Amino acid sequence: MIHALYSKLIPTLLLLVTFSNLTQAASPIADKALEAEIRKIIQEPMGELTEEKLLKLFILEAPGKSIKDLAGIEKCKNIALIRLSNNQITDIKPLKDLTNVQSLDLANNKIADIKPIAGLVKLQYIELSGNQVSDISALEKLSALNAIYMGDNKISDISAVKTLSKLSSLSLPKNQISNLAPLATISRITMLDLSDNQVADLAPLSKQTELRMLIIERNKIADLKPLVDSCKSDFSGPKRFAPFLRLYLAGNPLGADTVKQLEELKAAGVRKES
């Protein structure tokens, strides 16, 4: 009798196990932590995550959730804002076709290759500080970019920014940048942070006519003449930026002439903050 009972139960148990496995396999989101956050946001705690359901995801904010794998996020085609800072992400290839993304925050992950975002043409804001990025050429054709935050990486070449005419905030502290020549072709930057780099020549900044904050602490700057000339010219003319400029300069090997140069900057309205 017991044997007969087990014989009847076994098919049922097998069916339950099979159903459970199918349910698990049905999820298009590989990372369980990411899946859990997506389910919370779209209010689908149970059941299969169909492509139709994933189209309801417009904003994904899940910082510090131990997320490692983005596989499956490519099905969230309507997503416009992604904030996944302070996770353990290394591969961002699943983002490559998410062309509706306008804001992307992946700070403090383990990302080295950003080529997959080269086609995100609506991107306006990118935050990738605290990663392992050395090549930023993927940004070159992202003409909608307004703000780039990529401090604490391994960047030495900033040529990619020379075509970004809408760029107003550029934050690249703690990198390996020495050549600012690409900045000579754009003129709408209001905030520029290049602290803790290897910059010596400020001449490429002479065409920046919208600057409000210039952070160049701890570089190799000995001569402020290009900045002085630019500010004096602005102050005696349109007064577009010099009277509003805040300058952070500490930790540079300033030469003997800089005492006079700093006085000239002050006379043009520039505030030296450090």
Identify the meaning behind each predicted range:
Residues 56, 78-79, 99-101, 121-123, ...:
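Short "repeat-start/strand-capping" segments in structured domains, especially the N-termini
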Residues 58-62, 82-84, 102-106, 124-128, ...:
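Conserved hydrophobic beta-strand positions in leucine-rich repeat
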Residues 85-134, 142, 147-152:
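A generic tandem-repeat structural signature
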Residues 139, 146-209:
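Eukaryotic tandem repeat interaction scaffolds
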